[in-house]
Amino acid sequence: MANESGNIGVFGDLFTAVGDLAQQAVDMAGSALKTATDTVQPVTNACVQLCTTSINSATQLVEGATKAITTAIAPKQ
């Protein structure tokens, strides 16, 4: 009977150790996800700004070309 309580202690220690390892793994995964999110956010913002700037530049280029063509083909007075 005395050995049974010793086994319970060993199994309790084993379950505690496994539980601690599992909790550490979950904590590490959460930390990695937060780090990845924190890293991706500025890159995403930079890409959005680059796309917006490119679209605005292209729009200005088309407007300038349209104005130049319109001026060139307009009848002279």
Curated annotation (Swiss-Prot):
Entry keywords, A to Z: Bacteriochlorophyll, Chlorophyll, Chlorosome, Chromophore, Photosynthesis
Alphabetized GO MF terms: bacteriochlorophyll binding
Location relative to the cell: Chlorosome, Chlorosome envelope
Entry superkingdom: Bacteria
GO cellular component term of the entry, any: chlorosome envelope
One record GO biological process: photosynthesis
This protein's name: Chlorosome envelope protein F
Species name: Chlorobaculum tepidum (strain ATCC 49652 / DSM 12025 / NBRC 103806 / TLS)
Gene field: csmF
